[in-house]
Amino acid sequence: MKDEQLYYFEKSPVFKAMMHFSLPMMIGTLLSVIYGILNIYFIGFLEDSHMISAISLTLPVFAILMGLGNLFGVGAGTYISRLLGAKDYSKSKFVSSFSIYGGIALGLIVILVALPFSDQIAAILGARGETLALTSNYLKVMFLSAPFVILFFILEQFARAIGAPMISMIGMLASVGLNIILDPILIFGFDLNVVGAALGTAISNVAAALFFIIYFMKNSDVVSVNIKLAKPNKEMLSEIFKIGIPAFLMSILMGFTGLVLNLFLAHYGNFAIASYGISFRLVQFPELIIMGLCEGVVPLIAYNFMSNKGRMKDVIKAVIMSIGVIFVVCMIAVFTIGHHMVGLFTTDQAIVEMATFILKVTMTSLLLNGIGFLFTGMLQATGQGRGATIMAILQGVVIIPVLFIMNALFGLTGVIWSLLIAESLCALAAMLIVYLLRDRLTVDTSELIEG
């Protein structure tokens, strides 16, 4: 490993190390929002609602591909960080090689299994009439690019795992930048419409994946792309998938939860959907910053879990303090100028009032959300597969029974408060799980290596 990477893992002031790992991730999570709206933004110029719907309907498929990337990216990435903390550099090469080619294999399976059934999958997603063919065409490009999309998510995680978060951010920036350039060229210049939007995203992912591969080949002695090293054993598979599977489940279940929430809101009409949509966009930014903060320090926690428990605890304390500061600043803003913030999106006073109310409720849950993110990251970083699995399932499904109960009792107001109640339950569960696993979080390095 490079001396600079070791410095931030082992010696730099805790806050400096936290920002080194987290700031690029914060920027990256915000970029993901841009990524999500780019295609719709450019397609919007064509003023064809069917095309916009087609792109929107494919989001669950993208979530699945991201989840498959997390299966190896998060699972192997946290394992690699722990191996580096234990100074076991040679084993990390085998782990990375297996994960890279395992991800490519998953992508090829997606092509073989999903591509022939693009029309049927589009129909399952809800595409009808003119939207069906458009959605199917978009999916075909998405499926064909699956190996590179999955590989992109894996390699981005690996860059952070070895202490190179800036490389991770550069890769994401390059991908978004290329997509911004390609979308108008392919959509308008070549008159490819929806297919052009899909190709822009696909080519951007291919380019970013190649960027990461070239970087690792030239600069890393702990991540290998040598297929000869892709030799898994029982221990490797266990360490990767006990964290990778929960990360995969979280990606899938969170998308499902969003779908269920939309169904409840739709019952109250466009007024409710529009109000929630505005508040969601406002809460999304601090939420993504906190998510980036918590996910960014996962490699730092994983590394020091194996080498310096005291530093690991200091990192966790610094993150909690930072979450608290972000929360206080956001609450002050919402309760003083929240009405004006919402007013930037609409002049409809009924929507402004409801969206402001929703904003206050959802922003109140920001602290609890942050605790859930942090403790889930801790469980992933320290290899606590069972705890991570429980948290992944809870974060994905606990809101569903809460929604049914609160909707039956209090209507739309109950649906809104369900968000805070669900976050509270998940945060309490996370704290309980961490407390119950406290002995494992302080186990000696020698015991971990031998086990």
From Swiss-Prot:
<feature type="transmembrane region" description="Helical">
    <location>
        <begin position="170"/>
        <end position="190"/>
    </location>
</feature>
<keyword id="KW-1133">Transmembrane helix</keyword>
<dbReference type="InterPro" id="IPR002528">
    <property type="entry name" value="MATE_fam"/>
</dbReference>
<dbReference type="InterPro" id="IPR048279">
    <property type="entry name" value="MdtK-like"/>
</dbReference>
<feature type="transmembrane region" description="Helical">
    <location>
        <begin position="26"/>
        <end position="46"/>
    </location>
</feature>
<feature type="transmembrane region" description="Helical">
    <location>
        <begin position="355"/>
        <end position="375"/>
    </location>
</feature>
<feature type="transmembrane region" description="Helical">
    <location>
        <begin position="418"/>
        <end position="438"/>
    </location>
</feature>
<keyword id="KW-0472">Membrane</keyword>
<comment type="similarity">
    <text>Belongs to the multi antimicrobial extrusion (MATE) (TC 2.A.66.1) family. MepA subfamily.</text>
</comment>
<feature type="transmembrane region" description="Helical">
    <location>
        <begin position="194"/>
        <end position="214"/>
    </location>
</feature>
<dbReference type="InterPro" id="IPR051327">
    <property type="entry name" value="MATE_MepA_subfamily"/>
</dbReference>
<feature type="transmembrane region" description="Helical">
    <location>
        <begin position="245"/>
        <end position="265"/>
    </location>
</feature>
<keyword id="KW-1003">Cell membrane</keyword>
<comment type="function">
    <text>Multidrug resistance efflux protein.</text>
</comment>
<feature type="transmembrane region" description="Helical">
    <location>
        <begin position="318"/>
        <end position="338"/>
    </location>
</feature>
<keyword id="KW-0046">Antibiotic resistance</keyword>
<keyword id="KW-0813">Transport</keyword>
<dbReference type="InterPro" id="IPR045070">
    <property type="entry name" value="MATE_MepA-like"/>
</dbReference>
<keyword id="KW-0812">Transmembrane</keyword>
<dbReference type="GO" id="GO:0015297">
    <property type="term" value="F:antiporter activity"/>
</dbReference>
<feature type="transmembrane region" description="Helical">
    <location>
        <begin position="139"/>
        <end position="159"/>
    </location>
</feature>
<feature type="transmembrane region" description="Helical">
    <location>
        <begin position="97"/>
        <end position="117"/>
    </location>
</feature>
<feature type="transmembrane region" description="Helical">
    <location>
        <begin position="282"/>
        <end position="302"/>
    </location>
</feature>
<feature type="transmembrane region" description="Helical">
    <location>
        <begin position="54"/>
        <end position="74"/>
    </location>
</feature>
<feature type="transmembrane region" description="Helical">
    <location>
        <begin position="397"/>
        <end position="417"/>
    </location>
</feature>
<protein>
    <recommendedName>
        <fullName>Multidrug export protein MepA</fullName>
    </recommendedName>
</protein>
<dbReference type="GO" id="GO:0005886">
    <property type="term" value="C:plasma membrane"/>
</dbReference>
<dbReference type="Pfam" id="PF01554">
    <property type="entry name" value="MatE"/>
</dbReference>
<dbReference type="GO" id="GO:0042910">
    <property type="term" value="F:xenobiotic transmembrane transporter activity"/>
</dbReference>
<dbReference type="GO" id="GO:0046677">
    <property type="term" value="P:response to antibiotic"/>
</dbReference>
